[in-house]
Swiss-Prot record:
Belongs to the TRAFAC class translation factor GTPase superfamily. Classic translation factor GTPase family. LepA subfamily. Keywords: Cell membrane, GTP-binding, Hydrolase, Membrane, Nucleotide-binding, Protein biosynthesis. One of its GO terms (molecular function) is translation elongation factor activity. The gene is lepA. SMART domains: EFG_C (SM00838). Required for accurate and efficient protein synthesis under certain stress conditions. May act as a fidelity factor of the translation reaction, by catalyzing a one-codon backward translocation of tRNAs on improperly translocated ribosomes. Back-translocation proceeds from a post-translocation (POST) complex to a pre-translocation (PRE) complex, thus giving elongation factor G a second chance to translocate the tRNAs correctly. Binds to ribosomes in a GTP-dependent manner. One of its GO terms (biological process) is positive regulation of translation. The lineage of its organism: Bacteria, Bacillati, Bacillota, Bacilli, Bacillales. GTP binds at D23, H24, G25, K26, S27, T28, N140, K141, I142, D143. SUPFAM superfamilies: EF-G C-terminal domain-like, P-loop containing nucleoside triphosphate hydrolases. Its main location: membrane. One of its GO terms (cellular component) is plasma membrane. This is Elongation factor 4. It is found in: Cell membrane. Residues 11-193 form the tr-type G domain.
Amino acid sequence: MNKEEMNARQKKIRNFSIIAHIDHGKSTLADRILEQTGALTHREMKNQLLDSMDLERERGITIKLNAVQLKYKAKDGETYIFHLIDTPGHVDFTYEVSRSLAACEGAILVVDAAQGIEAQTLANVYLALDNDLEILPVINKIDLPAADPERVREEIEDVIGLDASDAVLASAKSGIGIEDILEQIVEKVPEPSGDVNKPLKALIFDSVFDAYRGVIANIRIMDGVVKAGDRIKMMSNGKEFEVTEVGVFSPKATPRDELLVGDVGYLTAAIKNVGDTRVGDTITLANNPAEEALDGYRKLNPMVYCGLYPIDSSKYNDLRDALEKLELNDSALQFEAETSQALGFGFRCGFLGLLHMEIIQERIEREFNIDLITTAPSVIYHVNLTDGSNIVVDNPAEMPEPGVIESVEEPYVKATVMVPNDYVGAVMELAQNKRGNFITMEYLDDIRVSIVYEIPLSEIVYDFFDQLKSSTKGYASFDYELIGYKASKLVKMDILLNAEKVDALSFIVHRDFAYERGKIIVEKLKELIPRQQFEVPIQAAIATKIVSRSTIKALRKNVLAKCYGGDVSRKRKLLEKQKEGKKRMKQIGSVEVPQEAFMAILKMDESK
C-alpha cells in the first residue's frame, strides 16, 4: 500500500466506544451495530455478543474489554472502517475505561430515556472529556412507556453541558435509530491523527492470556506500522519481544499482514506474562524506538484486600493454580500466601474494588470448583509508629499494639450519589452514619439531586452500596474516586473465643463506634456458633480492655435421670462429677467457627 492509499484509508477510519451506566442498553446497542454493519449473520448473533464471560451475561455487566472492526457503507457511498471498543461501565474498572477511551476519537453516550443521567454515566463522560473525545449523545429505550426523551435531552444539556439538540432517539432493542447513530459517527467522529512514517507507538488497552499463543495484546496504533516479524519493546519496562502475528477482531480474530496508523487490533509475540503488557503501556519498535511514551500510563494498585481460604484445606494448591490463571488475565489482581490459626493456609488477595473482589471469588468457585471462606475485606492503612517509622497494614491481624502507634491514616474517597429528591434525607443519614463529611449538593432538575460526600473507604467496602440501594428503593446510583489519606482515631478490635484470639475475626474500627460494633458482633457470634459441651465466653477486646462479652451456655446431659428418688448426696456426687468433666473439657476443648461467623463481620451494620 503506497502513501496516498494509506492516507486515504486513514481518513475513512472511525474509532469510538460506547459509554453508559449499567443497564442503559450499551451491550444491546453494540449488538445492533454489529448486526446493522453486517459483521454477523443473524444465525451467529446472540445477545450481549461482546460480553463473552458467563458472569458478564448473568450480571448484565461488561468486565473485560472487547474491540471489533466493522465495515459500514455510509449514505455518501463510501465504505468506512469502524472500530468499536467496548468498555466496562463499573467504577472498579475506571482505569480500564480511561485507557480504552484513549484509544478512541469519539464516544457514544447512551442515556436511558426513562432513568436519565446516572452517577457512572457522568464519571465516564468526564473521562471521555479528559481524553478530548467527540461525544455523541443517544437517548435509548424511547419505546418504554416511562420514556421522557425531552426531559433527558434537557438533563444532558444542563448536567453535562453537551449540546443535545441533535441527540439520536433510539431503541437498541427494537433497532430504532441505529442507522442515524452510524451516520453521526461518520460525520462527527474525527479521523485518527498520527503519522505512518513516524516510529511505532501503539497503546495497549487490554490483554488476554491464551494457553497456546501467550499474551494477546489489544492495541491501538497511534503512529507508525507494526507487522509480524518486527522486534518490539515495551516502554514501561524495556522488555523486548518478536511479533508472531497481528490482526483485527471482526468479531473473530482475523490475522492481517500489518496494522497501520489508526487501526485497532491485536498482536501476539510469545509473551508469557500479562504483567509485561500492562494496560496503558506503549509498544514501540526495538530498533527504531519512539522518543517518549504515550501519556496516562500508571500501575494499578489494589484498594481492597481480603483473605481467601479453601474450605477443604487439601485444595490449597488448586487455589494457588486458580489465582495464577486469573492473574494471567488480570494484572490488577495481587495475592500472596498467608496462614491463619483459625482458617489454615490461604492467600491474601488485593483487588481494585468490591465488584472486582466478588467477581474473582465467583470465578474461582465456578470455573475451578473450589469452595472458599473469605475474610472481611480491609483497606490499606498507613501507620505512623512512635519511633518515627511508618508501616503499611493491609491485614487487621498485623496491626501493631496500640502502645507503639503514634497515628493511623486511612484512605478517603469522594462519593457522588445521584438520587430522587424524596430520598435525600435517607442518603444523608446513611453517609453521616458512615463517618461522611458533606461537601456539596445540587439539584439536577425538579426530581434528581447529586450529593457529594467524603467518606472513609473502609466504610464503603462493607455494605455501603447494599444499604444505599435499600434505603432509596434501588433508585440511587453511586460512584467514588480515591482522594488520599487522612488521620483517624482507629483501633484494632480482637475477638476472643474461649479466651483465645481468632485472628481471622479481627477488624479495624473507629474508636467512637468500637463499643457498639463490639456488642453487635459478640451477640451475632453467640447466635451463629453452635453450643458446645462446655460453656464458651465470647469477648470483644481493644488491646487488653474487654469492651463486650457474652457466653454460649453449655449443652448438658441430665445425669440425674437414672436416680428416681434417691438420696440428695448421691445426686450431688453425680453433678460434681459432671462439673469436673466439663472443666477438664473446657481446658482442652476447641471451638469450631462456622463460615457464617466470618460473614457476620461483614454484615454487622445491618442490625444497627
